[in-house]
């Protein structure tokens, strides 16, 4: 559910006043993640790596207070549900968007992920959810990337998590992960904590 709230009654009051009308309010932080466990689980249990990564992002976001807030059209909104948006390569060679509701049940999330993305790919039609806080993702696995800085548009102020191809070594598999967020939504320290919590979610899976 989506509810408008008074920013002056939240701890984001100062940030809302400072950044709501800023020409470039988006910030990007990058952290290199140890994803060895995700790769191992993907191979052992048959999950797609992207499914596991998206589930970990959703699980971490659902426990992050700031990621339930979103500035939009000069107002501040609070959401009680999280969904993950993925970019899907469709059957015609183009791309579409697909929103997947987060659930703590990994098996259910996997079923939803496979069902919804398959439908979007086959029908070449994007699928969106209303009333959910959407955390965007973009996986550009064609090459290794050190950092991804998303283009700012006032049509999409949602947080976004982006990555490229992961890097294997003898003992670890590493992945630089870029996290873009709106400064009204959170401060740099909050974003850094989100990335650290995401790493811990991956470790604990």
Q: Model-flagged regions — what are they?
A:
Residues 1-22, 83-89:
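Short amphipathic alpha-helices and their capping loops
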Residues 38-63, 175-194:
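Acyl activation and transfer enzymes in specialized metabolism, enriched
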Residues 6-8, 20-52, 66-82, 97, ...:
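Gly/Ser/Thr-rich phosphate-binding loops and adjoining beta-strand/alpha-helix segments
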Residues 121, 198-205:
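A common structural junction motif
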Residues 90-145:
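Helical lid/core segments from catalytic subdomains that handle acyl or acyl-like groups
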Residues 2-3, 22-24, 82, 95, ...:
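Conserved GHKL (Bergerat-fold) ATPase module
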